[in-house]
């Protein structure tokens, strides 16, 4: 049976029960929730940043190229690094890269190199990879602690978080577009200081705090 079928059979009560009765799932899940929420919100507004804030919509293609290249490099590199570097430090490194990315997005918009560097740092997803491995390890921990092996329930945690953060991101991106006047035939020249401030607050400052 496919994992999709397994996930469908798990009720929300079972998933939340697995989270709250296994502290090794609870804290990584919370960390992943905050990471995922920040990442998907920022990723969802990058087009608006390039079109309405920076005024270079034709340069938006570089976002997908950098994300693809970094994704292909980081995933195979992670297990090699993990042989020599503890997961805790890889997680901290991933979060540090993300914070630096936000700093560059806020202060380095006029510099193409700094913007590209910010995109590189944003896509270094060590935090995500560490969380996935920690949740997998939590299956054994839960069996030792509670006497039950809830493998399917534990594996359903991450997809559930992804769906939740995706829904929140879609709502916030729509709100940002309307609240900051980034709709219709508007251009970067039409943006006021208030519009940019609204964009920065929801698209960058709040995710940075997360």
Predicted region positions:
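Short amphipathic helix-loop junctions that connect adjacent transmembrane helices
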Residues: 44-59
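A membrane-interface helix-boundary motif in multi-pass transporters
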Residues: 175-209
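Structural signature of the two symmetry-related core transmembrane helices
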Residues: 89-104
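A late C-terminal transmembrane helix in Major Facilitator Superfamily
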Residues: 148-180
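Hydrophobic core of transmembrane alpha-helices in multi-pass small-molecule transporters
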Residues: 113-128, 134
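Pair of pore-lining "gating" transmembrane helices in MFS-fold secondary transporters
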Residues: 20-45
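Helix-to-loop junctions at the C-terminal end of transmembrane segments
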Residues: 74-87
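Short, small-residue-biased leader/transition segments that mark boundaries at the very start
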Residues: 2-7
